[in-house]
Amino acid sequence: MKDSDNMIAKDEALRQIRLGLRRAAFLYHFFAKTLTDELGESQGRDLIRKAIDAYGEHIGREARRRADERGLSPTPENFESDLPTLAWEMERVVVDGEERVRVQQRPLAEEWLALGEPGKGRLYCFVDQAKMQGFNPDYEYVHTRNVLDGDPYCELVVRPVKRKVPESAS
């Protein structure tokens, strides 16, 4: 058997990835909806955030472990992307002097918008902050724009965390 016999076309790979992402979006949506329906909006949303934070921090710790194994420092440029690049159309842009990632194709958000509940979907986006917290808490992901907030695209930037300086005793 030739290697080419095991290859699939890029279009078919993308179709399959998007189908899997669509199902993941539905799964998240219906878990989130069930939690808020059963526990009430406030308690349900709190529990969703708790789960998303735990999930994201796990991903971040795994990325940190991989960076450590390769002898890399835990800086944003060494955080491995965990998104299938075929499914998310991203570009690097510079806005106000800082490098950001702008995402035009957002498979998960598109499903949540179609389901009519962008607010519950938006809670999932906090996974990015949790991933960086797990990878290196000295940095944070910031969503400067998000389609689930009504923006035309999603835009993210990684920034150093600003620590509050304790006031000295007088």
Task: Show which residues each predicted segment covers.
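A short, contiguous, amphipathic alpha-helix enriched in charged residues
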Residues: 125-133
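N-terminal accessory segment detector
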Residues: 1-98, 107-124, 139-153, 160-170
